[in-house]
Amino acid sequence: MKLNLITISLATLVAASAFPAHAGPQAHVVCGYHHTLGDDAIMMFGKANQAMWHDFFGNTHTDAVSTYQTLRAQPDTTCDNKADSSAYWAPSMKLPDGEIVNPAYQKTYYQSTNVAQYPLHPFPAGLELLAGDHHGTGPSSAITFLCANGKGYTNKVGEICGLRKAGDAVQFNIGIAFPNCWDGVNLKPTHTHNNAIYADHGKCSADYPVKIPTVNMNIAWVLPQISSLDTSKVELSMDPVMHGETREERWGSLYTAHADFMNGWTEDGAQFMTDLCMNQGLDCGTAVPYAYSKAEENTWVSSEDDKPHASVDTLYVQDDWTNGERTQHPETLTLVKFKIPPLPANMDASLFKYRIRLFGGKTETNGADQIFFYPTSSDWHASSVSWNNKPAINYRSDAVLYLNHSHEYRMVDVDKAVRKALAEGKTEISWYIGGDRQGNHYDFMPADSKQSLVLMLTGFKKTPEL
């Protein structure tokens, strides 16, 4: 049996009617269907094969005894972003002709609104959420339906889905928007207590004060075996009547649609999603890292200013190599040092990549140029390094960044250099950021700024959206 969430006020739910068009801060994952079980580790923990039939996405080991700890210990996932080993599940679907069909995939958008006034908090480790009502008899603003050839999302049943295009398949989607205000105490809902409710215009109540990203789960069924689908005749699995170990199956209308979410994001991933992505109003797409580290030290040194700059609010870069005369012109270099996030021991390392994310741009408006990331040692400190005592610089760059005057977030691929450092047993890595060799100026935000300066470890493998 599931907790009835229909009593939660949904009048203020934002963007449930068409969440893929959300224009605010967000990130997303695509997770393929993996398996079907009569299990529900949130509301029927330990009772294998006694729940309704559920289709599972994400973590491939989800069953009746799954927890955050088991998800992270066995993180294999069908999700494209390998920072997300969450478990997602929803009831199985039966077509009007009686065929029980598997979904193709689900795409979840993590979204929010009004983050400037009411910022988000990361998902706590172990958080479990429910959405929808498995006894529902009418429309809910948390549940939406889509025929891929139709007029967009609706919360009413009855549309006839046709082929997406001639000679193709019928596609039917169900969207489920989860509550986004946690009570701050209970990681797990119970039959008598909702551990989360919906925000009111982005604001959480005193009883549920912790604002978290809205989990907008969008499940897609792709059905090439039919040419039309009457959604009023589609059914979803309900809890069976158990006769000992024998199941007597029950089915309900689409209004019984609901879903479960068991957080399995890495703690770094959950933290980055809120603090360095959504709270800054960004759409980060799939660029939420498995792990990351802020620059533990960053500064700049100048040939015209032989002084340390222990505390900086801007990082500067400029050099001029024209006519082969680098040393005859002023030169300003930024120095950055990072702890290296280790590669996961229990996942395919080939799916992962190290990248630097930094915010900044060129001062001049004379077009785009490339700047260079030069390797150096990590035996320096921002409090004491200056031009004349700086570590040696190797002008054979590890990476280049092509950029113009627009000040924005930028990604730099440093994967080869970081893996080499790891192979050498290093736990830290440093670079100089050098200019375009044409005399132009560049500036970037340091690690302790709102935009920060981070070394990211991202893992990704594309999940097909059929």
Residue ranges of each PLM-predicted region?
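Gram-negative bacterial Sec-dependent N-terminal signal peptides
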Residues: 1-22
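A short beta-strand element within beta-rich, extracytoplasmic domains
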Residues: 336-338, 348-363
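Flexible, small-residue-rich N-terminal segments that precede or flank a structured functional core
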Residues: 287-343, 375-378, 437-438, 448-452, ...
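Beta-strand-rich interaction/scaffold domains
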Residues: 361-427
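Extracellular/lumenal carbohydrate-interaction signature centered on repeated Trp-anchored short motifs
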Residues: 328-330, 342-352, 421-424
